[in-house]
Amino acid sequence: IRMVCMILTYWLIALIPAIVMIVNKDKLTDYGFSKEKIGMQIIVGILIGTVMSVLLTLIPHLIGFGEFVDSGKRYKYLWQFIYEFFYCIFAIGLVEEFVFRGFIFEKIKRVAGKDIIAVIISSVFFGVFHFFSGNLVQMVMTACIGAFFCICRLKIKNCSTLSLLIGHGVYDALITVFASALL
């Protein structure tokens, strides 16, 4: 029950954007989701998350900087890792990508008329959102990761908000996997 409550609680973050979407009669496609080539979108997401994890988590662990990219979680049972992937994709990835790379990015892009402005503002919001879970350095790094996700969606073929929520979830989950295995 606690695990389900954690996911449902995280979904509350997306409540206001979801209400605005419903009131405006917007569709998920208005926020970067697509019905086309869903299999490719999933593969792109897995690749983005895996590459990010290798570059930003595994390599730092292997060269002695693991404590700087540590989630603080230590799992030893398979069910814990399975839940971590599920939670990171269907709570964190889904909510944060819908809100920041879907809703906020698209609303700013419509108002400003330029991708770059939407990338910068949505990424700054993403960084600020993460301020309370870390420090100023983490906030800046998270904003950079947000900008990277925006650029992926804009520049990579078959990269949608679905791809990003999967990539984000895989990246976050692999932080715990690598920390549990290597620290």
What are these regions (language model features)?
Residues 1-25:
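Alpha-helical transmembrane segments in multi-pass membrane proteins
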Residues 1-4, 26-92, 110:
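Juxtamembrane helix-loop-helix connectors linking adjacent transmembrane helices
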Residues 7, 42-47, 82, 116-121, ...:
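Hydrophobic alpha-helical transmembrane segments
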Residues 7-16, 82-86, 140-148:
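Membrane-embedded alpha-helical segments of multi-pass membrane proteins
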Residues 37-39, 78-81, 111-117, 135-136, ...:
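Membrane-helix interface segments
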Residues 72-128:
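Function-critical hydrophobic alpha-helical transmembrane segments in multi-pass membrane proteins
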Residues 128-137:
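Membrane-interface helix caps and helix-loop-helix hairpins in membrane proteins
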Residues 138-183:
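Functionally important transmembrane alpha-helices
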